[in-house]
Amino acid sequence: MPPAPPDQKPCHLQPAPYRALSETILFGSLNEERWWHSTAPILSRLLISSNYDVDVQYKYLSLYRHLVLPALGPYPQRDPETGIIATQWRSGMVLTGLPIEFSNNVARALIRIGVDPVTADSGTAQDPFNTARPKGYLETAARLLPGVDLTRFYEFETELVITKEEEAVLQANPDLFKSPWKSQILTAMDLQKSGTVLVKAYFYPQPKSAVTGRSTEELLVNAIRKVDRESRFETQLANLERYMERRRRGLHVPVVTADKPPPTEADKTFDACSFFPHFLSTDLVEPGKSRVKFYASERHVNLKMVEDIWTFGGLRRDPDALKGLELLRHFWADIQMREGYYTMPRGFCELGKSSAGFEAPMMFHFHLDGSQSPFPDPQMYVCVFGMNSRKLVEGLTTFYRRLGWEDMASHYQGNFLANYPDEDFEKAAHLCAYVSFAYKDGGAYVTLYNHSFNPLGDVALAN
């Protein structure tokens, strides 16, 4: 049965829960206080516009204050010469390098908090790959939140995260890993309307690949099989492996031409095939109920490639897959998605840099859920960072109306604008980084991964 049209309510520039809590919070540091006022208003508006009960809004803002704020590390600084606003540690979660991102599953009107937990040592010689802090953050989350089980985290950490000895090798041999994207563990919390929280961990094994000489695909696939002792995921994983092998035999990176740039240092950490394994995520719940999502990226960004990946080269053609593909084509057209051959970015696009024209590959995740379906359900993520934010929101509004989501179509643009009162909406191209599309349970699912930070005071961007 298709999901009901999502809730969406208009929200105010200064949401009441944020204002009320701000009057009573004793912050642990100036960093925490500044992070709060730069990010919490956005989270509060998202919870209001998505129609969370008031008591649940206060619960999640309190959780944000006590768990997340201490994990965001030093507040960003503005370089007086360049005007660039950045943190010491550049997080691979966000193209601006910031360690926080709110995402909005508009189909279910659910909000997610993405966090790259850091300390003042992250990115320094003391902790060049930010290896230690994410574990401590998740262990704190497990003490605070019922139902969090870290078994899967510890298992994947052992397989995919560098050891102290491997870290020393990478430090002594900097040419082994020259990519600016160094995050190994990211985290997320799905904020359910009921007040329960689903915690997830994401593992990026590129540093491990560089120091061991094993490919990203080998590390990811072997890790999944090692933790999947009951072979719940085997059929779906084997079909995904066969598709990746078919792609390796066929579509390789084309000869470089004027419009196909050479590989960046980040590109060199991945497979040369345009479709390359990237990372995985897992639910931090009881292992028998935990799902795994396998993420891969695609440098050829066009509808023909989307259709090939969506159908596993034409093998996945059940009615839901074909209906989803039909809607995906409308989605692509409505947002006027750009097409081309896009390498991994050379570096981050920190605040203060021009984001117009910034490009990156698209991504897909493949949902290994242990169901009877022989193919894992795909979800597409297109990078819209660098595209005009106003035109993107207008395109999304068109798509919402196509789906019959009238509440969302009526209020989405106004609510989006309220989060960025100091931005020039006509020129901004960084307010949304990715948009994802999936089709399940007879309906479309769209999630927005939005800019989640407004700088304060002397750090604010000059007009």
From Swiss-Prot:
Keywords: Alkaloid metabolism, Prenyltransferase, Transferase. Brevianamide F binds at M93, E101, Y204. One of its GO terms (molecular function) is prenyltransferase activity. It is an enzyme of class 2 (transferase). Pfam families: Trp_DMAT. One of its GO terms (biological process) is alkaloid metabolic process. Pathway: Mycotoxin biosynthesis. The record marks G114 as: Required for regioselectivity. Dimethylallyl diphosphate binds at R112, K200, Y202, K293, Y295, Q379, Y381, Y445, Y449. The keyword Cytoplasm does not apply. The keyword Transferase applies. It catalyses: brevianamide F + dimethylallyl diphosphate = tryprostatin B + diphosphate. InterPro entries: Aro_prenylTrfase (IPR033964), Aro_prenylTrfase_DMATS (IPR017795), DMATS-type_fun (IPR012148). Its EC number is 2.5.1.106. Brevianamide F prenyltransferase; part of the gene cluster that mediates the biosynthesis of fumitremorgins, indole alkaloids that carry not only intriguing chemical structures, but also interesting biological and pharmacological activities. The biosynthesis of fumitremorgin-type alkaloids begins by condensation of the two amino acids L-tryptophan and L-proline to brevianamide F, catalyzed by the non-ribosomal peptide synthetase ftmPS/ftmA. Belongs to the tryptophan dimethylallyltransferase family. This is Tryprostatin B synthase. It comes from Neosartorya fischeri (strain ATCC 1020 / DSM 3700 / CBS 544.65 / FGSC A1164 / JCM 1740 / NRRL 181 / WB 181) (Aspergillus fischerianus). The lineage of its organism: Eukaryota, Fungi, Dikarya, Ascomycota, Pezizomycotina. The gene is ftmPT1.
